[in-house]
């Protein structure tokens, strides 16, 4: 390890400082004034910005002055997790749910046997779409895959270049049915063109809607907005539909009374689609479903759907409690609580996983994602702040050896980090091997090695203060974003087969992986660049863009990055939903949804460094609290 050298600064610098020993254990914190002292990493000056008051520094027992992020501690302690209780795991609730599933299936099937009263050839298409949309938004669609396909096949058989009407015998097409059909069919991989929406414009090129904002009219525009969010690259009409419908709905919210409809509109405008995690949507939709005119007019009794949705939500809640208890035991057993230099967000990561994958059989995915993200966070804080460049180079080499004996050359605190990476990656590979029927360790190790290399590059930029070109930073940043390593092993533990040709369409070199990694890097940087800069991490998408384009402002850079994000989202939509793909949507959905989960975490701010109100609310609404039956 190279010695720490000191140089003079022009004025005294007061730093909130903690003492930390070699194992990473925090000693008594205190404030001291360090006169005229700054640190060099590997002979490179760390600027005053890197020693700002947003960062705590610490002197370890080997006299190394370490940078340390000022992060709050774990919010969900062991006692709290153990105090959670649920009786919804009892067999009687599962039996009750199974009876309701059978009744709802009968309701689905009754659509095919039209009685001329509750459903007719004049409304059979919209009824089918409403049914599919309802079970999906309530989070119970996994029970009705066969019925959903049958319903959508029927709707698609009547789809035309001008859209559809409410029923197969409708004389004219209908914007509400067409918008809901476009969205629902596209989400299931049917080949439907957005150009169909052009047929609902007037001579001025505007979407034809009456000025009078009736409930039916508002719902039509709401479905138009929801459809516009499932846009593919180059679809101008979808951009126009989104702009028009968003403005219309915001205006409507100012005029209509507070109601289930206004809450539904507010939720959809707030989350859109890419950050509206399925379990969160189910939790919110349960609160409003069955309270509006549209649902009460439906041929299907909403009470059955609502009761089933609540039961399924709470039955999964009981499983979440058991999985959380296991996760906390793993976290403690791994030695993570002693790693005081890093963030501990394993409960938040588990919450994100359970919001995108709440099928009971995907326990391995949820726990694997939480573990992988915890490791990523530990490594992030070690490479970005706590470790010295010499130490990080040793750690990077040790990871590539993949042998516990490689820890002999590491500082004490790094030995614990190494072993949690080594043990957890090996354990997750064993689970993946069982699911996939082949060895996966070497393939997954390669992904982790590339990830560590990308971190090492960033550590060198931090040490030197270098701001690379945007392209260089962006390509490295997509790897260091961690999307690939957070997704790879968890998806391999599912019951979905991933032969080599399928894996290539989800992992590298797929466009899906590239775009999912891109959105995490781009959105993460827009939320973190100021705090990172205060810690001495100068390189970001924003700073690199400004360097490449002299004279541009931060606002210019942010506008450019946000435009890139919009394009990336459309590209992701296409990679997931493109028709006639050789890889089914089900094989790509988990990796895609992981990008949605990370995007949610950065929706308002950096929700990983600081557990925001929104993050805490997500944990409470989707994991901690059951719904009232």
Swiss-Prot record:
CDD domains per UniProt: Terpene_cyclase_plant_C1 (cd00684)
Cofactor: Mg(2+); Mn(2+)
Principal localisation: plastid
Annotated Mg(2+) 1 binding sites: 380, 384
Record field: catalytic activity: (2E)-geranyl diphosphate = (1S,5S)-alpha-pinene + diphosphate; (2E)-geranyl diphosphate = (1S,5S)-beta-pinene + diphosphate
Keyword Transport listed: no
Subcellular location: Plastid, Chloroplast
Cellular compartments per GO CC: chloroplast
Cofactor note: Binds 3 Mg(2+) or Mn(2+) ions per subunit.
Keywords associated with the record: Chloroplast, Lyase, Magnesium, Metal-binding, Plastid, Transit peptide
EC numbers, comma separated: 4.2.3.119, 4.2.3.120
Motif (DDXXD motif): 380-384
Binding site for Mg(2+) 2: 380, 384
SUPFAM superfamilies xref list: Terpenoid cyclases/Protein prenyltransferases (SSF48239), Terpenoid synthases (SSF48576)
GO MF assignments: magnesium ion binding; pinene synthase activity; terpene synthase activity
Domain statement: The Asp-Asp-Xaa-Xaa-Asp/Glu (DDXXD/E) motif is important for the catalytic activity, presumably through binding to Mg(2+).
Similarity comment: Belongs to the terpene synthase family. Tpsd subfamily.
Role this protein plays: Monoterpene synthase (TPS) involved in the biosynthesis of monoterpene natural products included in conifer oleoresin secretions and volatile emissions; these compounds contribute to biotic and abiotic stress defense against herbivores and pathogens. Catalyzes the conversion of (2E)-geranyl diphosphate (GPP) to (-)-alpha-pinene and, to a lower extent, to (-)-beta-pinene.
Protein name: (-)-alpha pinene synthase 1, chloroplastic
Provenance organism: Pinus contorta (Shore pine)
């Amino acid at each position: 390890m190279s010695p720490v050298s000191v140089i003079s600064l022009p004025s005294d610098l007061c730093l909130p400082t903690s003492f930390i020993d070699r194992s990473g254990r925090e000693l008594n914190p205190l404030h001291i004034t360090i006169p005229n002292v700054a640190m060099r990493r590997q002979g490179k000056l760390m600027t005053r910005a890197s020693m700002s008051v947003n960062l705590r520094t610490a002197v370890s027992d080997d006299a190394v002055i370490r940078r340390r992020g000022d992060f709050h501690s774990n919010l969900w302690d062991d006692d709290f997790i153990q105090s959670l209780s649920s009786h919804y795991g009892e067999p009687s609730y599962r039996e009750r749910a199974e009876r309701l599933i059978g009744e709802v299936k009968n309701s689905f099937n009754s659509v095919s046997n039209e009685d001329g009263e509750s459903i007719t050839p004049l409304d059979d298409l919209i009824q089918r779409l409403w049914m599919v949309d309802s079970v999906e938004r309530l989070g119970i669609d996994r029970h009705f895959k066969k019925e959903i396909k049958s319903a959508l096949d029927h709707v698609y058989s009547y789809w035309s270049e001008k859209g559809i009407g409410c029923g197969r015998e409708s004389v004219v097409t209908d914007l509400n049915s067409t918008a809901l059909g476009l969205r629902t069919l596209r989400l299931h991989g049917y080949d439907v063109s957005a150009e169909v929406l052009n047929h609902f414009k007037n001579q001025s090129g505007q979407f034809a809607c009456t000025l009078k904002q009736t409930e039916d009219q508002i719902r039509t525009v709401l479905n138009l907005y929801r459809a516009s969010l499932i846009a593919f690259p180059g679809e101008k009409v979808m951009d126009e539909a989104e702009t028009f419908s968003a403005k219309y709905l915001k205006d409507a919210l100012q005029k209509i009374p507070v109601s289930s409809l206004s809450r539904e509109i507010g939720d959809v405008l707030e989350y859109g689609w890419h950050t509206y995690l399925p379990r969160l949507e189910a939790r919110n939709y349960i609160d409003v479903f069955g309270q509006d005119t549209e649902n009460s007019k439906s041929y299907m009794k909403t009470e059955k759907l609502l009761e089933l949705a609540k039961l399924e939500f709470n039955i999964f809640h009981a499983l979440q409690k058991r999985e959380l208890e296991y996760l906390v035991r793993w976290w403690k057993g791994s030695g993570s609580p002693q790693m005081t230099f890093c963030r501990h967000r394993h409960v938040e990561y588990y919450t994100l996983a359970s919001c995108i994958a709440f099928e009971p059989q995907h326990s391995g995915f949820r726990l694997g994602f939480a573990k992988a993200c915890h490791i990523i966070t530990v490594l992030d804080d070690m490479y970005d702040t706590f470790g010295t460049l010499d130490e990080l180079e040793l750690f990077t080499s040790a990871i590539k050896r993949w042998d516990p004996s490689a820890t002999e050359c590491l500082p004490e605190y790094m030995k614990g980090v190494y072993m949690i990476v080594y043990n957890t990656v090996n354990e997750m590979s064993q689970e993946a091997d069982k699911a996939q029927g082949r060895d996966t360790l070497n393939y997954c190790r390669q992904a982790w090695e590339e990830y560590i290399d990308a971190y090492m590059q960033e550590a060198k930029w931090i040490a030197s203060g270098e701001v690379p070109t945007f392209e260089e930073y962006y390509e490295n940043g997509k790897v260091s974003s961690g999307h690939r390593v957070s997704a790879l092993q968890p998806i391999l533990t599912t019951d979905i087969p991933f032969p080599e040709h399928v894996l290539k369409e989800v992992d590298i070199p797929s466009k899906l992986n590239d775009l999912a990694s891109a959105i995490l890097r781009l959105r993460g940087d827009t939320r973190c660049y100021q705090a990172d800069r205060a810690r001495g991490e100068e390189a970001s998408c924003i700073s690199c863009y400004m360097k490449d384009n002299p004279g541009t402002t931060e606002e210019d850079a942010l506008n450019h990055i946000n435009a890139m994000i919009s394009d990336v989202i459309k590209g992701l939509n296409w990679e997931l939903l493109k028709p006639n793909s050789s890889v089914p949507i089900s094989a790509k959905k988990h990796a895609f949804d992981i990008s949605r989960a990370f995007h949610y975490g950065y929706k308002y701010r950096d929700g990983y460094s600081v557990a925001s109100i929104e993050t805490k609310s997500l944990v409470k609404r989707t994991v901690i609290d059951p719904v009232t039956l």
